[in-house]
């Protein structure tokens, strides 16, 4: 049963499901992990076949997909649209209130996929050689399935929860999230009252080429996007008569100063901790230096070597990338206006306002206008949350040589919408991923290993149960 009310859609309890899946704690059923793992594969195949490319999004299709699964299992859900077709879905299992809520978030939109360059249909859900292909398999429809099955498994098992468990599927993350996480946090803050933690994309279980787990990475901080446009104006004219002070020339001179500017090195707590935790994985000659990265970067020779890797360089300084240039649309016309856009990423303890003043000093031309296109306030999550303790338990059980650590995310996710309201949000994909895995995110032939999906789904279910204060019953033996 569904009723539309403006941009809101409620999906009620399935009568048949309600009569069969509600169980008291005393009647808690065993868990057949093999069946759940197989269900994760089939569910992700179906989910990948729903095209939620952003733009335009059409995330309501994805929301309705989950709403049906929830209704079939006696779980009420609500879909709220920020605009027609731009759906966000929430579903909740109630606990007894002795612990705070756990929110399981993923984004339902995906980036475009050009089928000409794929070896499989980007929206076909094809399995080949043990891998499941489709746009969003990792980013983040696979996580959405693991989150949904956490909710469904807890419901079906009749387990008593201490805290609420909330499924949240949002729109628009790939375009900044204003119509997704930003919208629901602003318009429905009551959904998140009494929340202990939001689990989102970002961190991951890192594995080596042989599949051995080397660390559990929890993203507690990310760099701050600070996008600006530089605009120069001047007298237009014919290209045959150059103007030394033309808009284009002044802009190029300003950009030359920006490109030549080297921002100072700075090691934030998450980066210092990450390299200390993982130094033992590096070649032996580098281990002492990485164990105290902040001190080691004071050595110019080491700093030069370390920052020659563009990924490492981005972790220890504010970065500026020139990404767009606009001027005349004709070769023989000197434009009246020329502009450039800069993608600036600030370390999580930096102040965008202060950096803007520093940028203007570097530009050193008061005639150049600097416009802010995008800026988020700095926000991080604490490093002493229960989540870290639970993952240490898992590491001790499943990968005794692995550590739990805090990689800094160079990009940004929807976590900032929650951190800005003092709600702890952490990035943690429950999947064991390696360099090859990340190489296909936003690329051609995005895919996830079937075994990786199955194992990650179980990890998420076990993690959520722990955080919600629930004890999982013994699973049924595999056939």
Give the residues covered by each predicted segment.
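Bacterial N-terminal signal peptides that target proteins for export
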Residues: 1-13
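Bacterial N-terminal signal peptides
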Residues: 11-21
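Boundary at the C-terminal end of the N-terminal hydrophobic targeting segment
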Residues: 23-28
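N-terminal helical capping/dimerization or prosegment-like subdomains
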Residues: 29-115, 337-339, 352-353
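An extended, acidic, His-containing surface patch that forms the Zn2+-binding/catalytic region
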Residues: 97-99, 204-207, 266-329, 336, ...
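Active-site metal-coordination/substrate-binding segment of hydrolases
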Residues: 99-166, 451
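Acidic/histidine-rich catalytic neighborhood of metal-dependent amide-processing enzymes
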Residues: 132, 138-217
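A short core secondary-structure module
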Residues: 182-186, 235, 240-264
């Amino acid at each position: 049963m569904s009723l539309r009310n403006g941009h809101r859609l409620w999906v009620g309890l399935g009568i048949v499901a309600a009569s069969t899946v509600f169980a008291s704690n005393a009647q808690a059923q065993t868990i057949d992990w093999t069946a759940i793992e197989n269900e994760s594969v089939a569910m992700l195949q179906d989910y990948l076949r729903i095209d939620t490319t952003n733009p335009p999004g059409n995330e309501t299709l994805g929301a309705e997909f989950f709403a049906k699964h929830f209704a079939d299992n006696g779980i009420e859900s609500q879909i709220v649209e920020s605009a027609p077709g731009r759906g966000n879905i929430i579903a909740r299992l109630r606990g007894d209130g002795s612990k705070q809520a756990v929110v399981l978030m993923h984004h339902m939109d995906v980036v475009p996929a050009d089928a000409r360059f794929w070896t499989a249909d980007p929206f076909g859900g094809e399995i080949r050689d043990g891998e499941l292909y489709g746009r969003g398999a990792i980013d983040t429809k696979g996580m959405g399935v693991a989150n949904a099955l956490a909710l469904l498994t807890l419901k079906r098992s009749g387990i008593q929860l201490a805290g609420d468990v909330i499924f949240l599927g949002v729109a628009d993350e790939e375009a900044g999230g204003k119509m997704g996480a930003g919208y629901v946090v602003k318009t429905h803050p009551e959904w998140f009252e009494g929340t202990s933690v939001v689990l989102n994309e970002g961190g991951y279980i890192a594995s080596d080429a042989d599949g051995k787990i080397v660390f559990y990475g929890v993203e507690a901080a990310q760099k701050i996007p600070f996008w600006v446009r530089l605009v120069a104006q001047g007298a237009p004219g014919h290209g045959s008569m150059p103007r030394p002070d033309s808009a284009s020339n002044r802009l190029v001179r300003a950009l030359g100063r920006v490109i030549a500017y080297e921002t100072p090195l700075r090691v934030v707590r998450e980066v210092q901790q990450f390299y200390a935790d993982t130094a033992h994985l590096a070649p032996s000659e580098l281990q002492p230096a990485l164990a105290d990265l902040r001190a080691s970067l004071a050595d110019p020779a080491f700093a030069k070597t370390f920052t020659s890797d563009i990924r490492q360089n981005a972790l220890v300084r504010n970065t500026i990338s020139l990404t767009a240039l606009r001027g005349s649309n004709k070769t023989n016309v000197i434009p009246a206006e020329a502009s450039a856009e800069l993608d600036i990423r600030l370390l999580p303890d930096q102040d965008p306002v202060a950096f803007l003043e520093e940028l203007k000093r570097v530009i050193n031309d008061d005639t150049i206008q600097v416009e802010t296109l995008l800026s988020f306030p700095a926000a991080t999550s604490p490093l002493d949350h229960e989540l870290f303790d639970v993952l240490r338990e898992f590491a001790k059980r499943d990968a005794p040589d692995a550590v739990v650590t805090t990689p800094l995310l160079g990009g940004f996710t929807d976590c900032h919408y929650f951190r800005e309201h003092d709600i702890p949000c952490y990035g943690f994909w429950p999947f064991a991923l390696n360099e090859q895995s990340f190489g296909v995110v936003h690329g051609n032939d995005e895919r996830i290993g079937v075994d990786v999906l199955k194992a990650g789904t179980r990890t998420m279910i076990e993690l959520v149960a722990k955080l919600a204060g629930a004890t999982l019953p013994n699973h049924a033996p595999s056939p």
